[in-house]
A protein has these predicted regions:
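Short, small-residue-biased leader/transition segments that mark boundaries at the very start
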Residues: 1-8
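Short secondary-structure boundary/capping segments
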Residues: 7, 21-25
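Catalytic Zn2+-binding segment of zinc metalloproteases
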Residues: 13-22, 96
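Acidic, glycine-rich loop-and-strand cores that form catalytic or ligand-binding grooves
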Residues: 24, 31-47
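Divalent-cation-assisted or electrostatically stabilized phosphate/pyrophosphate-binding catalytic cores
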Residues: 27-34, 102-121
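Alpha-helical scaffolding flanking metal-ion-dependent phosphate/phosphodiester catalytic sites
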Residues: 41, 48-99
């Protein structure tokens, strides 16, 4: 499927920038994102601030400021699909042999009430992660290709 190749080619290329590599090398632990360790030490992460502003598959990219303050914009479906792929891959990498098809859903649900995400974006990513937990990765990819992809 050609769109999967497009995702692969552009996915998270900013990770190779100096600021993100520096964060990754300095705070690498192997079981969680180096960004979390940098935030614990500094209270923020320069690597994350750089990363989220350049990668549209992160919900934080879609925050804007209006007359009533900060609000969440609805993410286009293709970026929600990329977010799904990113979350599943991160769960596989950080959880290693403890990974299950419910891992990404559990992680998302753990932080779900603390994020500012558009309700339709939240509903779609939650649906995809729940589908994965119930049907497995192969069926979920097939479902995304046949039923979700615009």
């Amino acid at each position: 499927v050609s769109w999967l190749g497009d995702v692969y080619k552009r996915q998270d290329l900013s990770k190779y920038s100096y600021i993100e590599l520096k964060t990754g090398f300095h705070y690498y632990q192997g079981f969680r994102s180096p960004i979390d360790a940098e935030k614990e030490e500094k209270g923020y992460s320069l690597g994350w601030l750089h990363h989220k502003g350049r990668n549209k598959h992160h919900w934080e990219y879609w925050l804007d400021f209006g007359v009533d303050g900060i609000y969440a914009c609805k993410m286009p479906t293709n970026y929600v699909i990329e977010m799904f792929c990113d979350r599943v891959a991160a769960s596989m990498i950080y959880q290693k042999e403890k990974y299950t098809d419910s891992s990404a859903l559990e992680y998302y649900e753990n932080g779900r009430g603390k994020i500012l995400i558009h309700p339709e974006t939240d509903a779609l990513i939650h649906h995809l992660l729940k589908y994965l937990s119930e049907h497995g990765l192969d069926q979920t990819i097939h479902y995304i290709i046949t039923e979700i992809k615009e």
